[in-house]
């Protein structure tokens, strides 16, 4: 290399002839320093190759730029210091079109390293900025001196330095060569504006004709990359061949590497005017689209950036995006066509609908299919009734052809207020009330069945005080007898009737020890069959704790207490509250009736309560009936029977109260017809349809038929009780379907609908 004329500024003259230049050889630098904490937590530098650009660039004189490289064997027992990178001036861009960043020499960490061990000798390395005359190896003798190193890597033509016995950690560095290694390990997800390099051929016997020589250390520039590998994590650093290195570039490795690492260093010189395989234009590189794997959330990474044990190698070329999409489409089609052949298909249609069929389907969607076609998954039509519900086709199907869902069959109750509006009079109008007292007192309200409802009451001032009388009718062991008592001028407080307290009041009628059975005995006064059925339903709930059965029991309590008078408990003898019953023959003798306004307010709150409960019960019935035709068959049959029995018992009482309290015969007739035609027919007809495979109630035997109801002991016990009730009142039940209203008989309409449910099931 003595024939190479290097000027004082580190550049080679333009008259340099590469044919007289020796073959470029690589020189090794050993890495054998104890690990220390990184001086810099992140690095974002990488070499920018300028080969292939035929432009001049003038570089300002750098006082810290070495004319001759200085090298020394790095002994493990010596320490050395770094040069401050901030003191280095920046390159200028006199004639080059892009900004040129600082010199790699200036990027060397300036943080001094502490002594590696207390027992090691003191002897720092020569600083990089030392005078030129102190360098023992000038740049001209670099070629010959490096050739003297022993080489055992003859297979690849690169010298190697044997590792030391004791494992050593790698020291941090800010050399651009380390970032250059990561640039070479970038995946296809890198920016299209970056440079990609290709491994040079190992044989350098014949170099292309070169016009002039450029020092590679002066063509390294900073690059700002957004790749995720340029973060504070150094897990992607591995042993890599052919990096551009310098004597102080082996200190930027993480301390996690505890073993000695050998580095191979080589320079690849390329002229500006030659066609070199080491540089590839980024425009010609097309970034492949990774094929989506089973886990699309995890990005595809190259082995060079994701693995810390294997050297970074370029993956073979992937398939084109078109091929990837085609393969993905094929897999999707196979997954769609891979259905089991034994899967049950709903319907028989194999192709698209015809125009007339499409029009018919659109009309049916607007009208909704009838219950039969909905449950049996048949094609419905616009007929009234539809073709499927005709007598010649329905056979055992006795459900009315209706398009109303079960949860909506309570439509007949719209605007029905006969359960509480009887006590509404002009006395409750706003014009009759002058005001309310600010003082409130607590009254303990009851219906006479052992439970108490506390309510805040206040005095009300009215113009006409002749509207506070309460009348009721009793039929206990005799004909109907009417009573009337004047009550106190009190109303509920500012908060009114609490919905939560009222619900808890109803719950205590069910949860108390024997309270529900006592309520049934006292209120229904021995109504045949209905009394026994309600007690059986309560015992079934007590054993199963089914919430829907509880709602049904709460429904019948709430409805009957809505039409019941209210009493006041806990009054002393000195409390002169009006409303005490002194009439002989009344079962309420000696008790005090609640003020009429509070009685009405409780009725309104109770009426809203049982209407909500009935809505919930109808929704449960709708889902239970649907489950029968969805594959569960008779699993929910006992629950359906209990719910239907209680619901029909409430509707029977509603018919009687409508006759008894409504003075308009036409309105009463319409209400009863609306109830019996569709709602009662749907409940009874559907129960008949799902009971075809079960024996009659009078023929039920647990030992013989228990398997039909999944051998449930609670269900079998309830069925045994129902069989006893039906057997006891069979003749009575068969005569109840034709019963008529009688104002003197409160049980005249009892079991009218329940008998249809039981007898038709037989």
Swiss-Prot record:
- Map out region (Disordered) in residue numbers: 267-361
Does this UniProt record's set of keywords contain Metal-binding? yes
Give the main location. Answer: nucleus
Q: What happens when the gene is disrupted?
A: Leads to longer aerial hyphae and to decreased conidia production. Decreases transcriptional levels of the central development pathway genes brlA, abaA, and wetA during conidiation. Leads to increased expression of kojR and kojA and a subsequent 6-fold increase of kojic acid production.
Ranges of compositional bias, category Low complexity: 294-312
Q: What GO CC annotations are associated with the protein?
A: nucleus
UniProt keyword Oxidoreductase present: no
Q: Which InterPro entries match?
A: Fungal_sec-metab_reg_TF (IPR052973), Zn2Cys6_DnaBD (IPR001138)
Under Gene Ontology molecular function, one entry of this record is:
zinc ion binding
Question: Where is the protein localized?
Answer: Nucleus
Secretion signal, residue range per the UniProt entry? none
DNA-binding region ranges: 370-401
Q: Which residues form a coiled coil?
A: none
Q: Which UniProt keywords apply?
A: DNA-binding, Metal-binding, Nucleus, Transcription, Transcription regulation, Zinc
The role this protein plays is: Transcription factor that regulates conidiation as well as kojic acid production, likely by negatively controlling kojR and kojA expression.
Q: What is this protein called?
A: Transcription factor kpeA
